[in-house]
């Protein structure tokens, strides 16, 4: 007798082992038809999986997130099936699920073209109509490797050799195609109805630039066409908002081959940067942080003591001088510990909060670089809090409050918070981890925040909180971090004198709100589609004269506004006013101030807000007050 507990708490009993599909059928024909897989004691399995013991089971359908993952994984295999039918000489490698879709890497003797993608997608649709059953079988390592070698699939054979001996080798087949996979997969290809191939890109075998370059075909798959259409529309909008395109259009920055992963900031872009940095500086100063500056290049011995030389050297830029090895800092924390150590610290000095807009460099792979979002040289709004164990909860509460306020001011209202908990390999005792994890929970609760817990995702030296902001397109970006560190203070010898005159290690909190300034500016540009709110905009206003006779008034008006702190410029070119308005509208300036003879004579200004909104003629003082109200409300 096999007892199956269902999600509603009911128990069904069967006289013999049953498959997931049979359980679904016993519940109802609708569920049997909708079943894509099952969650057996928490593990995703195929509908063909046999249950021969008492267990809990949830039937997975296309209404579940797991169901969508199964669909996407199966569509990746369908893609490989279609490619092999159309291009038999192509070799298949791997095809995982990714955010919003999947990809599959192929080795082929020529580049795939857009026309090839159309043919492949059409063939996939034909295979779906066949509704071929997907079958799974477990085979020996030798049998699997021998099979793939016999059909010339050397990459699959290599993958099999790298699979741990204890793992099962599963082969999935539909029609004339067989692939190596952990699964699970849909019961038949007819379940895969909504998909689209997106693009081809290059990729290295096993992600190593020393290996062969493969061709990666990206695709997306959904349960409903409406969802796919919405996603494709979002991609179109994202293309319009691409910060690289807007950076060029708005003359904010550029990047060039002579300095890969580094940014050349133009005057307007640097003005935007300065608004963000000055705002962040004001907020951390108000929160009791002390701003410091630490060296960019430090001796190898310090990086060895911190552990970075042993564990992070591949990502560090190094140099040598006078027979000494140095590294350009990839992060600021070791330098901050040096400042803390400089002089005897007492418990009365704590908490000490050190902030730095620290310039860091990391040797990212060239293929991973992406505009401002992934760079080699970047500045972090970094800070480290040194406190006692009794203070770390109150410090965490204060940081949560500060971070939420900052995100709101920048226009981000939806923040997802994730708490990463202890990994298997970790420093410190279970009791220490218990206190640390519960302390971070208590801090989040005190702020009225909700969070998702990620068991096993913490760093070996402590748990952390991540802050993921959602932009205008619903995309999630991890920006802020609050990381508790149980290791670095000890590694680098940080200590303070406690109230009983003993020497103790401080608790160290690594924290950032925006993270990489470059990346955050890229996110801001895309979130606002380049139309930065007035408090951030490089120019808040442009004064435009209609004719030469108003040029002097326009110039004096711009100078007067500048003295009042307005970021303003005057466009006195001898061009039609309609041309100038159109040009500055495309530059997304918040306010256009038009002056003609009437405005000059009355010492007023005609104000047009971004979006073509005519606010009419008003005294200059009224415009300044309106702008100041925008700034007060972060508009």
UniProtKB/Swiss-Prot annotation:
Catalyzes the attachment of threonine to tRNA(Thr) in a two-step reaction: L-threonine is first activated by ATP to form Thr-AMP and then transferred to the acceptor end of tRNA(Thr). Also edits incorrectly charged L-seryl-tRNA(Thr). It catalyses: tRNA(Thr) + L-threonine + ATP = L-threonyl-tRNA(Thr) + AMP + diphosphate + H(+). It is an enzyme of class 6 (ligase). The keyword Methyltransferase does not apply. Keywords: Aminoacyl-tRNA synthetase, ATP-binding, Cytoplasm, Ligase, Metal-binding, Nucleotide-binding, Protein biosynthesis, RNA-binding, tRNA-binding, Zinc. It comes from Burkholderia lata (strain ATCC 17760 / DSM 23089 / LMG 22485 / NCIMB 9086 / R18194 / 383). CDD domains: TGS_ThrRS (cd01667), ThrRS_anticodon (cd00860), ThrRS_core (cd00771). Residues 1-61 form the TGS domain. Homodimer. GO terms for cellular component: cytosol. Its EC number is 6.1.1.3. Binds 1 zinc ion per subunit. This is Threonine--tRNA ligase. Its cofactor is Zn(2+). GO terms for biological process: threonyl-tRNA aminoacylation. Its main location: cytoplasm. It is found in: Cytoplasm. Belongs to the class-II aminoacyl-tRNA synthetase family. Pfam families: HGTP_anticodon, TGS, tRNA-synt_2b, tRNA_SAD. SUPFAM superfamilies: Class II aaRS ABD-related, Class II aaRS and biotin synthetases, TGS-like, ThrRS/AlaRS common domain. The keyword Zinc applies. Zn(2+) binds at residues 333, 384, 510.
